[in-house]
Amino acid sequence: MQKLHHAQGMSKETFLAFVLIGLVLGWISGTLLLTIDILFPGLVFVVLIYIAGKKGGKFLLIFLIPFVFSLAISGVLALLPIERGFKNIQGIIIETKANYFIMSNGIRRYYIYEKTTIREVGDIVSIKGYVSELSFTEYESKFSFEEYLRKMGVKEQINVSSIAAIFERPIRLRRKELLFLNNFDPLTKGTIDLLLFAKKDYSNETVALANTIGCLNILSGSGIVYAGFLRFCDTICSYRFKENQTKIIVFILAVFTIPLFLGKIGAYRVLILKSFDVFYVLSKKERSPYLFRLSLAGLILFFLNPFHSLNTGYLLGFGLAFYIFFNSSCFYYFKNKQKKFLKFLSLEYFLLPLFNIRGEFKLLAPLFTFIFLPFAYCFSFLSLLSFLSVPYESLLKFCSSFLNKSLVFIDKISLSIPLGDFPKWCVFLFYFAIFLALYFYDLGLTHFSKIGAFVQICSLLVPSLPVMAPYIQQVSFINVGQGDAILIRDGLTSVLLDCGGVLSFDLAQEVDIPFLRKEKIYKLDCLIASHSDYDHIGAKDSLTSKFSVQKFVTSKEEFPLTIGNLTFVNYNVYSGENVNEKSLVLSLNFMGKIFLFTGDADKNIEKQIIRDNPNLKADILKLGHHGSKTSSCKEFLEQISPEVCVISVGKNNKYGHPDKEVIKRLNELGLKYRRTDEEGTITYRRYFHQPLGDL
């Protein structure tokens, strides 16, 4: 098999591969131009310049010209100023989901919220509304919808006043999809939505279980389902038709069913490769090398939408295809069955980072992937037939129930290791080392190839080891949206003051626990509740059932409270009528600074505290009640005189926190303040008892 470095002269597959890599890397670099993440594509660029340079000037130019071209365009788009104000915008819809769609006017892309939208990709609309920068409530360690949109090139959102359709696509599948799903109970509906339409409703039990055990990406992989369906059709047709006839029939089926997978990059890749098969059959030309076809498919998708370069599905899908291509020579001397098994193991190895779910590495996820993949094919095929004909309610309900019960059983035996999330640089290093190892292996430099393999293992293993845990001291104001959760850590002693709480999802499972694992904390010595408000302690039951919590404290009588070397003093010793007046106000002398955590204590409590404690000061003040004007009176702020105030608050919250009056007061007093809705989790940390830096 011809590889890039073995190509004599400038073969067409080598040419396309270098052009594709240059375009994709250039687009990523331009988009990340003003961020620290530019270091990742920068390192790849340096290595590829070296490789291309070693091959000769032509290779260097073929890589550099597309790179610079792509970098220039994406850089300009990234630097475009944000639009604001009331506007009338026309554009084409390029993506639709259950409750929003993305529209492009040719230069900019806009997010538009629309409850239960039935719009289709390809519709052209005219929208009147107020344009502003993207702004969504974000949570620590949880999926960032805003980051996802920005990777798609979306920087603005439109608060719609009116929408007028200019052109509507004749085939209206979205409406049919909704009508079809309404025939089923919620559990079956969620399963069909996942396996056929690749939409993940995390409130659905099946979806949540699949995510927990680590096989959600496979079950929702529409490209995999699409390819599996076509492979099944290919097998059936091969019994009746000749090879070339089979390819044409399968391609017709692929074209017929692709509307079900619009917006799914994996499905597009499969369709393009199938179209190549038909082209070679009809033109009677010799089939081009796989590398040529794969690179050409990547280029077609890139030019259809350059922002695919930032899509995990695009990068992982083509990265996996290139990996399998270059990795095939490693199994050359094995027998057929051994070769298939080793290729499967190799595939699972490539997908290892995907098996880390919420900071837990799922040991059996590769096995579950192998088990459920055939089921995904069968269920998706039945769902597709049902969608195209009549609803098979009883059959699909039975299959959905079987899958759900299987997932419940497997969840009980699922083995996992709490490693914490893999940092971005670790995942990058893992994949970068894989391709370097393959490159060196093909060159015959097995020594360097082994070093690459060692780097791969270290990139995921070393950051997961809690070697620094005994030497870390930190206070983290965790971004739990509109609520409070504060981690105090002194080496191996960890205390959580409040844990937040929201009604829409399990905050402990999706925010608190993943954050603790990311910090290499696997038990809490104490959970303290400042008071009983749900936004402070609503996640407590879930947290204590899923994570090791040694002690739970909520009573004032337990203070002063000493946990390890940490001593908390409560200053709210007064009797209050409402729940906020009962909130603990805790002081902690730690890391050479005095912290004051005020919970939701109001002005009345603040005034009593400074009256009875005239010498009370603090370096870092957690502002009361999320910046509400019911707290943070002038007298309290003047006496406490903090170096910095921290406001734990959710973005775009319905209460208007922090209140403008409070912000004005802080500015008038010259007090610096930081907000979790703007910065995310705010952490003060030091190692080996070194002095704490700037606050």
Give the location of each predicted region:
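Cap/insert and terminal regions of metallo-dependent hydrolase folds
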Residues: 608-680
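Membrane-interface helix/helix-cap signal primarily in integral membrane proteins
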Residues: 2-9, 67-217, 509-519, 523, ...
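Active-site environment of divalent metal-dependent phosphoester hydrolases
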Residues: 226-227, 263-269, 309, 532-538, ...
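Core dinuclear metal-dependent hydrolase active-site scaffold
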Residues: 306-309, 411, 418-526, 556-620, ...
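Aromatic-rich juxtamembrane segments at the membrane interface
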Residues: 4, 153-273, 278-282, 568, ...
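Membrane-interface amphipathic/re-entrant loop segments adjacent to transmembrane helices
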Residues: 356-376, 383-431
